[in-house]
Each structure stands twice: as C-alpha cells, then as structure tokens.
C-alpha cells in the first residue's frame, strides 16, 4: 500500500485516484467528486449501487459553492445547517449545478458535511474543494474504525493511504434532510 503525504494525496486525487483516509468516526474512501471514473471506482470497490448517492466532505462552505443550493432552504433551516458546521453533521441539501448523477444517485439532493476533523479539513483545503467521503468498507460490512481494520481486499485496489487517527466518534456521522429536518441515519 502506497503511503501518502498530504501533497502526494492531492496529486493522487488530481490524477483520478482513490485514497483511504481517517474521518470523524471511521476510515473513509475519497476521490474527486467531479471525476466520474474515480467515483465509479469507489462505487465498484465498495460494491455500492450508484442510486444511493455519495457524501461530500469540505473544509468550509465556500468549497460547496455550486454543489449545493443552500439558499433554496427556508431561513430557519439554513441557520440550523450552518450552526451545526464545522462538525460531525451530514445534511442532504438541494443539489447545485456541479452535482452530477454519479454523486447524487437517484436523489435531487446531495449529502454534504463541513468537517471539523483536522486532517479531513486540511486535505480538503490542500485539494481546494470537496471530496467524496464514504466509509472504507464493502457494502454490508462493518466500517473500519482503525487502520488495522481496513479490508485487505480494498487496500490492494487503492491508490494510496493518508495515515492519521479517526476523530473518535462512536458512530458514523448522522445524516439529516435539511428541508424536513428528518434524521435519515442516527
């Protein structure tokens, strides 16, 4: 497995690669959400149906410009979303023009999070935008909380791994619908 530095992780992403990196609760797989082939590789690696859509993670709200339409939410819902970030809160927001079907799946919204995890935020800043962030496990298998738990079947197919520690959350981040406030994953 190729060990990555922050700079080599960014170079790998720019080349359409898929990397593993630690997130708030579990290890994640990441790629450029604009790179269709890279997103399809993540879906194949995880054996995840495209219809489910993907989560994007960013360092700040500006990185989500064009990906989401926050202004389409009522003011109170906008305030609730913004008050929860940066943090371990994933929201389904109305999708913007940059959000392609290989990221949104069969949905009109897109799942996004502005992370407070130091390495995730640093990676997104170095990359210059949001990244796909999905748990580094095969569909139906438990997610890896520690690097040692990463599935060797996935590891050998990745373009590299950015080492670090997860943020210590007991569960993956909750997912809520920003329009309704409904919790989709707790």
From Swiss-Prot:
Domain YrdC-like: 3-186
InterPro entries: DHBP_synth_RibB-like_a/b_dom (IPR017945), Sua5-like_dom (IPR006070), TC-AMP_synthase (IPR023535), TC-AMP_synthase_SUA5 (IPR050156)
PROSITE patterns: YRDC (PS51163)
EC identifiers of the protein: 2.7.7.87
Gene Ontology cellular component annotations, sorted alphabetically: cytoplasm
A single GO BP: tRNA threonylcarbamoyladenosine modification
Keyword field contains Plastid: no
Enzymatic reactions: L-threonine + hydrogencarbonate + ATP = L-threonylcarbamoyladenylate + diphosphate + H2O
SUPFAM superfamilies recorded: YrdC/RibB
Entry annotated with the keyword Mitochondrion: no
GO terms, molecular function: ATP binding; double-stranded RNA binding; L-threonylcarbamoyladenylate synthase; tRNA binding
Membrane-spanning ranges: none
Record's subcellular location: Cytoplasm
Record keywords: ATP-binding, Cytoplasm, Nucleotide-binding, Nucleotidyltransferase, Transferase, tRNA processing
Top class in the EC scheme: transferase
Family label: Belongs to the SUA5 family. TsaC subfamily.
Function: Required for the formation of a threonylcarbamoyl group on adenosine at position 37 (t(6)A37) in tRNAs that read codons beginning with adenine. Catalyzes the conversion of L-threonine, HCO(3)(-)/CO(2) and ATP to give threonylcarbamoyl-AMP (TC-AMP) as the acyladenylate intermediate, with the release of diphosphate.
The protein's name in its UniProt record: Threonylcarbamoyl-AMP synthase
Organism per entry: Stenotrophomonas maltophilia (strain K279a)
């Amino acid at each position: 497995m190729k060990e990555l530095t922050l700079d080599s992780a960014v170079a790998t992403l720019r080349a359409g690669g898929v990397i593993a990196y630690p997130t708030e609760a579990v290890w994640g797989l990441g790629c450029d959400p604009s790179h269709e082939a890279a997103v399809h590789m993540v879906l194949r690696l995880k054996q995840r149906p495209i219809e489910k859509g993907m989560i994007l993670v960013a360092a700040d709200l500006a990185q989500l410009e064009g990906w989401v339409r926050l202004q389409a939410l009522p003011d109170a819902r906008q305030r609730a979303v913004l008050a929860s970030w940066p943090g371990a809160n994933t929201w389904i927001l109305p999708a913007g023009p940059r959000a392609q079907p290989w990221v949104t799946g069969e949905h009109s919204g897109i799942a996004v999070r502005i992370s407070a995890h130091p390495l995730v935020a640093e990676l997104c800043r170095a990359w210059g935008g949001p990244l796909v962030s999905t748990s580094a496990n095969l569909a139906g298998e438990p997610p890896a909380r520690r690097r040692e738990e990463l599935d060797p079947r996935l590891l050998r197919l990745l373009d590299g791994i950015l080492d670090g520690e997860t943020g210590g959350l007991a569960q993956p981040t909750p997912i809520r619908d920003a329009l309704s406030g409904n919790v989709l994953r707790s």
